[in-house]
């Protein structure tokens, strides 16, 4: 006789299998092409991931890639296994940065980038994006005692951001147009950005608010840091894939849309943004915004520019 926990696990597996079948059904009659044909032939799918983008895509103490993005990505991988008829499909995890993520997708090294990449119209010439799975805003992380409360307070100060990001572009534009005389440090990733901030080399860190919450969580004393500033942009996160590959994009979009339609994505959101997560077992306490709820109610891949 099944115990309640075993029954729940069985139900979850059945729901997941049904979702995969639903995502693959519209494509079942089509011969495989593009990325799916490549994956079937090689029996390998290459997944791009981040190393320190808590809680979306990062590496835990055991070396496993985890996070909200990765949980969704795992569902795509299951659908790819079903569509290609490769239950033993191998997964190759490839760490990516803000600088190399697009080239690695373009040149075929990475089949699907499951990180924290913003869907920008300007990027559509190089890559394609899936249905949006998260929406963030760009703000500042600073010490509670710094006196920084908004972007005008950064005049004459040193600020860190991540190289190759929307935040870097916006910060440099602001600096030039408003003659703020900021010194801007471009970090290669969130780990380097956090160290730059904590060491005092920068007075503030500009990035997406939810990622700044992750940086704060990783600090020795999270209560010493605060997220401030008028949002400078809204960022629609999507999985990145090669352009002109409608078959693969339809599969990825189908998996995400099914997760939203079934409500499964709400449970994943609760897991990663409202409950304790590794590595410190702290909760982000980051409730779902109305903008995100609207996206889940009507899934689409439109950028927010």
State where each predicted segment sits.
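Bacterial N-terminal signal peptides that target proteins for export
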Residues: 2-16
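Extended ligand-binding regions for polar small-molecule ligands
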Residues: 30, 36, 71-79, 152, ...
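Extracytoplasmic small-molecule ligand-binding "clamshell" domains
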Residues: 30-113, 262
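A structural signal for short loop-to-beta-strand junctions that line the ligand-binding cleft
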Residues: 36, 65, 116, 123-133, ...
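Bilobed "Venus flytrap"/periplasmic-binding protein-like clamshell domains
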Residues: 46-55, 65-82, 118, 136-194, ...
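Periplasmic-binding protein-like
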Residues: 51, 134-145, 209-210, 217-256, ...
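Acidic, polar ligand-binding/catalytic clefts
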Residues: 74, 78, 85-153, 292-303
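A ligand-binding cleft/hinge motif common to bilobed small-molecule-binding domains
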Residues: 99-100, 114-125, 170-177, 191, ...
């Amino acid at each position: 006789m099944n115990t309640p926990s075993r029954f729940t696990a069985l139900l979850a597996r059945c729901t997941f299998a049904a979702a995969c079948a639903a995502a693959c059904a519209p494509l079942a009659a089509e011969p495989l092409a593009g990325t799916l044909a490549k994956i079937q032939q090689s029996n390998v799918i290459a997944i791009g991931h981040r190393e320190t983008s808590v809680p979306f895509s990062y590496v835990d103490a055991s070396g496993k890639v985890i996070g909200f993005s990765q949980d969704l990505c795992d569902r795509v991988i299951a659908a790819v296994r079903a569509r290609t008829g490769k239950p033993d499909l191998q997964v190759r995890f490839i760490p990516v940065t803000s600088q190399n993520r697009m080239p690695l997708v373009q040149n075929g090294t990475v089949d699907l980038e499951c990180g924290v990449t913003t869907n920008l119209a300007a990027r559509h010439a190089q890559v394609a994006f899936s249905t949006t799975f998260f929406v963030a805003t760009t703000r500042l992380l600073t010490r509670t005692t710094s006196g920084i409360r908004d972007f005008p307070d950064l005049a004459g100060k040193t600020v860190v951001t991540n190289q190759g990001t929307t935040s870097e572009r916006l910060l440099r534009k602001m600096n030039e147009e408003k003659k703020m005389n900021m010194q801007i440090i471009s970090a290669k990733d969130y780990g380097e950005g956090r160290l730059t901030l904590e060491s005092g080399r920068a007075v503030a860190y500009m990035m997406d608010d939810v990622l700044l919450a992750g940086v704060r969580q990783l600090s020795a004393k999270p209560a010493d840091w605060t997220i401030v500033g008028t949002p400078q942009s809204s960022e629609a996160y999507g999985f990145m894939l090669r352009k002109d590959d409608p078959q693969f994009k339809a599969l990825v979009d189908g998996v995400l849309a099914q997760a939203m339609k079934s409500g499964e994505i709400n449970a994943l959101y609760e897991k990663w943004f409202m409950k304790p997560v590794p590595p410190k077992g702290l909760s982000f306490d980051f409730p779902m915004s109305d903008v995100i709820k609207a996206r889940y109610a009507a899934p689409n891949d439109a950028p927010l520019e």
